[in-house]
């Protein structure tokens, strides 16, 4: 069986934390900020961990990423 390849799109969007969890940036941060209130914009700046339900799928995409 051939080697699995790391999904390059996913690899660029996700970083692994020291404890092995996966950190991602939030969506809705590229434009249309006039429609978003200050609290929402502040919360969008913070990174978020990949949810438990998505973890298995994302780990398959990142087979060899450390």
Curated annotation (Swiss-Prot):
A GO biological process held by the record: translation
GO molecular function terms noted in the UniProt entry: structural constituent of ribosome
Disordered: region residues: 1-28
Keyword annotations: Ribonucleoprotein, Ribosomal protein
InterPro entries for this protein: Ribosomal_bL35, Ribosomal_bL35-like, Ribosomal_bL35_CS, Ribosomal_bL35_sf
Entry-linked Pfam families: Ribosomal_L35p (PF01632)
GO-annotated cellular components: cytosolic large ribosomal subunit
Compositional bias ranges of the Basic residues kind: 1-16
Keyword check for Manganese: no
Keyword Glycosyltransferase: no
Sequence similarity: Belongs to the bacterial ribosomal protein bL35 family.
NCBIfam families named among the record's database cross-references: rpmI_bact
The name this protein goes by in its record: Large ribosomal subunit protein bL35
UniProt organism field: Staphylococcus haemolyticus (strain JCSC1435)
